[in-house]
Every structure is written in C-alpha cells, then in structure tokens.
C-alpha cells in the first residue's frame, strides 16, 4: 500500500485519515478517543510500536519469542505453586502456603487463573505460528494441490469475458465509487463499491444489469472440481448456525448459506455465501487450529458466542484475574531485584 497519504483535521475530535496514493482507498479514519483506547489496548497487546512493527520479520520473531517465554514462565509458576501447596497441605487444602501478602495473593490468583494465563500465551503464539506437522491430519501434498487448484480456478479472465459494458453499470447510480473486475470459478462479475455497501453485478449478460449470486449448480460444479466424482457429499441450505459456522455478536457470519458436508477423512464442511460470493472451508485441521488460537485466546466457542452476556462475564473475569496475576508477579519480581541490588551493594 505504501506510500500512503495521512491527513490531519483541525476539528475538536482531531481526526486523522489514512488513504492509499494508488487508488484513493480509505485505510483508516481515527479520532483522539479511538487512538487513546488503541494505546491502552491493541498497540501494547500486539506490540504495535512503529519502530518494531515496520520491520515485520523482527516483529513476528519478537512476539513469538515473548509468547513462548510467557508460556514457560506461566507453566513454571503454576508447577512451583502446586509443589509448595502440596508440601504445606497439612495447613489445609484451601489455604495458601505463603504468609506474606504479595506472595499469598500471587499464589491465589495463580491457582485461579494460572491455567488460563498459559493458554492465553500459548494461543497468542499460535496466532503467528503454523500448527506443527504432528498435529496436522492432512498430508502436505494434498494441501499444496488444493491451493494450486484454487489459484488456477480464480485466476484473471480475459477482458472479452466481461460482456456487460462497465459504463452501463456506472450509469445506474451516482454513488458508485469503484468497480473491480472479479470472477468466481471462471464466472465473471463486477464488484461494485458504493458509499457503505458492496454489490456484485453479473457481467456475462450484454444487456441487463442484474445481481450476481451463486447458484446450486455452480456450487455442485465447484465441489466436483475439488473432490471428483468418487467422493460422496450432500448439500443443504443452512439458515441457522451450526458447530462449525458461527461467530461473535459483532462478527456474525452471514445467513443463509449453502453447506456441503463431504464424506472424507478430514470431515470437510464447505460453506458458500451466495450473496457475498465467498466460500469457507473447515476440516479437522481447521477445527484444531481454530480452537488453539481463537478458541483459547478470545473464547471463540459456540456455546459462549451464542450467549453474549455470559461471554462478557467469563472474558472480563479472566482478563481481570490475569491482570491481577501479572501485577502481583511484577511486584514480586521488582522486590526480588531490589533485594539483589541491596545485597550486592553490601
């Protein structure tokens, strides 16, 4: 996207606008309030500091190593806490083996939230790391074939394939901001971006301007191209979320969609959105990766996402508990360092 334009607005909200120099597309529009919360949330959470983030390889390695070390520290702390508790269990099963205040509260918060701290650090590591091969079910050769086949199907079409003149589409509305020549499995269409919406127009017709959407026959053809005629599968129209197709309240996946259940070793499910022209694929490897990352990191679990209030309660409880656990750990670390410095000076 570089270079880009950055505009500063002289208004009370101190808006800032980022826009691409190539096509004028808006990348980001912020105000002082959103930037303030970004510095309290996303920036420290993802280590989005400009001096580091502009070096992508270094940033990825830093986050991976930090998350890995965090996993080891959390696991070691939980293990040592359990050991100390077991040695002092004669004091009572529900009593801390420590008497000093900071040690006691660090122990209690570690018992309650230590496991979640480990899974949070581990899932953060998984966000930038591929699943190890021993956890994957699909062979590498099959993954490469699937990727290369999809690239050939969605490759660029010749201009002649777009029978409908784009100027005819432009004449239908004054709100059109951009037209993109697109295709889905060799079927041409125009992606029309308006003020706040995106529409797909069938470009195979030379006369009428009509929406482009996926049909059942197009989906059947796509499934046969992917799996051949020897693999059995069935298709239905999904109007409610299932165990594989769902999302959080603000990121709910669109409905209805066509669901294809494939009878293969990977228990593959395909979800086709006929209006937005998109396909989602989920198999055993995808389910494992989703659990290891979004499931553990943001509680992206259907039982909780279907109950937003419960999701908020659980998430805020874990975040507050994890923050307190980290705070007590930092205090104890600072106290230990000060003791070492004082001892060294003597």
For each predicted feature, which ranges?
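Conserved histidines in hydrophobic membrane contexts and catalytic metal-binding motifs
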Residues: 1-346
């Amino acid at each position: 996207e570089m270079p880009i334009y950055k505009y500063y607005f002289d208004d009370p909200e101190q808006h800032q606008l980022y826009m691409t120099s190539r096509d004028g597309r808006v990348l980001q529009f912020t105000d002082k309030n959103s930037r303030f919360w970004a510095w309290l949330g996303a920036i420290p959470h993802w280590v989005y500091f400009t001096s580091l983030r502009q070096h992508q390889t270094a940033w990825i390695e830093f986050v991976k190593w930090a998350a890995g070390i965090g996993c080891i520290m959390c696991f070691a702390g939980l293990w040592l806490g359990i050991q100390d508790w077991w040695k002092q269990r004669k004091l009572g099963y529900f009593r801390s083996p420590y008497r000093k205040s900071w040690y006691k509260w660090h122990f209690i918060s570690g018992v309650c939230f230590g496991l979640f701290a480990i899974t949070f650090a581990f899932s953060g590591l998984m966000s930038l790391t591929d699943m190890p091969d021993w956890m994957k079910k699909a062979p590498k050769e099959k993954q490469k074939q699937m990727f290369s086949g999809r690239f050939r199907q969605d490759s660029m079409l010749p201009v002649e394939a777009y029978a409908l003149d784009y100027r005819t589409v432009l004449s239908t509305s004054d709100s059109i901001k951009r037209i993109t020549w697109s295709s889905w499995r060799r079927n041409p269409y125009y992606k029309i971006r308006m003020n706040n919406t995106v529409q797909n127009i069938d470009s195979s017709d030379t006369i009428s301007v009509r929406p482009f959407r996926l049909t059942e026959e197009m989906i059947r053809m796509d499934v046969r191209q992917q799996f051949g005629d020897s693999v059995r599968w069935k298709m239905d129209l999904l109007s409610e979320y299932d165990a594989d197709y769902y999302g959080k309240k603000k990121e709910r996946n669109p409905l209805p969609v066509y669901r294809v259940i494939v009878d293969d070793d990977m228990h593959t499910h395909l979800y086709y959105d006929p209006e937005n022209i998109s396909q989602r694929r989920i198999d055993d490897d995808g389910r494992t990766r989703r659990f290891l990352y979004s499931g553990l990191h943001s509680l992206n679990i259907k039982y909780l996402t279907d109950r937003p209030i419960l999701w908020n309660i659980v998430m805020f409880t874990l975040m507050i508990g994890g923050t307190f656990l980290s705070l007590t750990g930092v205090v104890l670390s600072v106290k230990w360092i000060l003791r070492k410095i004082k001892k060294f000076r003597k």
